[in-house]
Amino acid sequence: MKIVLASANKGKIKEFERLLPNDEIVAFSEILGKIEIDEDKDTFKGNAIKKAQTIYDELQKINFGDVVVISDDSGISVPVLGNAPGVYSARYAGLNASDKENNEKLKAELNKLGLEKTPAFYTACIAIVYKNEVYTVHGWMYGEVLNKEIGTNGFGYDPMFIPNGYDKTLGELDEGVKKEFSHRSKALKLAMKVLEVIL
């Protein structure tokens, strides 16, 4: 089955390809070119649905045919910071901020509170649009966020996050290990069950 991913984030695309090796994953930009989608909802679910529905609607305009569009919205939440960055994780340091800039901002916020580490959790919401029906699933990963980066694997806040049950950051852990328990892989396992039912 061809699955169109409503994301231009190369890190996310690679992760979806690893988690769904038997499906043809195509980034929407390969078909539609550049489309800016304003992630203006205040929940991960709202943003995921908006992205998937927007891309699905654009594909219908060009008569792309039977297609599954999958989108995710995800981020890290730090309770001591009022669950920030939350839905603003990708733009915590500003619109078009790099991973490095976002990490620096989070470190600065933790340092203001004198925290070397504190509880945090990742949330992933996956939205699936097929035959104009919308389905959503969630996955979570709990652990601690550090005020420093360790390791170079992964993307985003991975080098700052130690998942529960581990003594290394996601930036230090092998991608195969992360695949077993990440918020996105948990959500994708549920998404696979949805796809089995609807396809």
Curated annotation (Swiss-Prot):
Active site residues of this protein: D73 (proton acceptor)
GO molecular function terms attached to this record: dITP diphosphatase activity; ITP diphosphatase activity; metal ion binding; nucleotide binding; ribonucleoside triphosphate phosphatase activity; XTP diphosphatase activity
Amino-acid positions noted as binding substrate in the UniProt annotation, renumbered to this chain: S7, A8, N9, K10, G11, K12, S74, F155, G156, Y157, D158, K178, H183, R184
Keyword rRNA-binding tagged: no
Keywords of this entry: Hydrolase, Magnesium, Metal-binding, Nucleotide metabolism, Nucleotide-binding
Binding note for cofactor: Binds 1 Mg(2+) ion per subunit.
Family: Belongs to the HAM1 NTPase family.
PANTHER family per the UniProt record, alphabetical: INOSINE TRIPHOSPHATE PYROPHOSPHATASE (PTHR11067:SF9), INOSINE TRIPHOSPHATE PYROPHOSPHATASE/HAM1 PROTEIN (PTHR11067)
Function: Pyrophosphatase that catalyzes the hydrolysis of nucleoside triphosphates to their monophosphate derivatives, with a high preference for the non-canonical purine nucleotides XTP (xanthosine triphosphate), dITP (deoxyinosine triphosphate) and ITP. Seems to function as a house-cleaning enzyme that removes non-canonical purine nucleotides from the nucleotide pool, thus preventing their incorporation into DNA/RNA and avoiding chromosomal lesions.
Protein name: dITP/XTP pyrophosphatase
